[in-house]
Structure formats: structure tokens, C-alpha cells
Curated annotation (Swiss-Prot):
Family, per entry: Belongs to the ribonuclease III family.
Pfam families: dsrm (PF00035), Ribonucleas_3_3 (PF14622)
Listed EC numbers: 3.1.26.3
The protein's name in its UniProt record: Ribonuclease 3
Amino acid sequence: MLRNKIDKIRLLFRKDRESYSCFYRILGFYPRNIRLYEQALLHKSTAVRSEKGRPLNNERLEFLGDAILDAIVGDIVYQHFEGKREGFLTNTRSKIVQRETLNKLAVEIGLDKLIKYSTRSSSHNSYMYGNAFEAFIGAIYLDRGYECCKQFMERRIIEPYIDLDKLSRKEVNFKSKLIEWSQKNKMEVSFELIEQSLDKENNPVFQTEVRIEGILGGSGTGYSKKESQQNAAQMTLKKIKGDPEFMASVQEAKTQNNVPAEDTTPESETSLTAENQQIDEIISTEEISV
């Protein structure tokens, strides 16, 4: 409280007080290092460079924010759902940190109006707002630390926009979404039960692997075949979206399997980008109230 009063007094003498006030309305506190928040909203399409000539955009902050957001949301979900199993907690967290939810949250708090990007660039994508939200979390972490990040998520995001209990009951069928993607892109997908064992309490545990054109995509465990398939499909969808080397291996395997493949000219890079955007659209088709 005292810190905020001191910040308000200092603000009166700053030339950029309008920017500070804008961030205060979103954060609930005044930034200490406002440059972090400004960079969090700087899309790579602007081609801005630092004094040393390095690209200046929000990608590094996005990387950091993604990791911090996973930890914070995991922390919140763990404390809220006492006694729930790991699979339940993982799925609930995934529903919050998925790209469509982050896109909506960015709009709700007004980040979409603050993002700087080049209108001449064609590099914009359907998850630019969500990326900026993650970068914003990274900025808060560097500026104020983990606890402040957690308070921001609890008070400014979860409480006003997300009903955790309602969200946890909403089922997301990752297997059907992966199959839908494979059909759109003419890819062969298989689900293989590779192990069945018992845990310490003699409950059956299943492990499933997903392969695309014979290439291992992801594996998942669960207390039923369905749960293990869902977890494996979820991991595979993330890999499709975020691992270009994996997708290159899949495309190569598709060609070797004599299935019509995309051209390997530079246009194929655009095809891979389109596939990744399709993944975001497919993963995000469920309606989550934020």
C-alpha cells in the first residue's frame, strides 16, 4: 500500500505518466521497469532493434512467461482442487493456458489495443494476443517476482474471468481433435497401447503412444485406456504446434510412405505454418467462458 502511494507521487513528475497509468489499470500496481511491459507488447513484425542492433520484440518474454504461467496456474489449480489426481489437474491447467483462452483474456484486459505490430507484415497469426499475454506475464515476473505474478493471475484474471469448478467439468476431447487435424492434412495417425501395469494400490495404469506416419508424437498414461489416449493426444497436439523438427520428420515419413506430400519448395514452409494455425483453431474450438 505504502509502495503504491510512493509510486503515485513519483508518477506526477514523469513525462510518460500516461503509459504508467495505462498499465496500472491492467495490473493494479505501477510498473517499476515499464520498458519490460512495453517490450512484452512489441510484436516481431515491427522489426525494431536495440541500440546494439539486436531484434527487440516480445519473443523472449513470451518464452519466459509461458513457463511462469504453467507454474502459477498449476499452483492455483493444485490449491483449489485438493485431493484431485494429477491427470485432472493437468487437464484443468491446460484449459486455462491454451491459446484460445489466453487470446480471450488478452482482449478482456485490453492488451489487444496496446500491441504494436506492422500492418505491412503478413506474419500475424491467430494467437498473437495470447503470445502477448504470456510475454506480459514474463514482464511481471522480471519486474515484481513470482508472488506478484500469482496475485495478478488470481485477482485480475481467475476471479473475474474464469470459473475453475465449471471449467474443470468441461471435457476436451484431444483425441478427436488430433484425428480431425490428421484428416484435414491427410496424415496417418495411430494410437498404440504399449504397457499396462498396476500402481502401488493395485489400480490398473495404461500407457499409450501416438504415432503420425509412424513417427512418435507423444505418450500418455492414465487409469483407463481412454485417459491415456487423451493425454497422449494432448502431448502430440502440442508437439505438432511447437516442434518444427518433428513436423519435418512427419512430412519426410509421409513422402516415404508414398502418401501425397506437400511440395518441398519454399511454399511448403507456408503450409507448415498453416498446419500449426489449424492446430490452434482445432484445439480452441471448445467454448471456454472467460
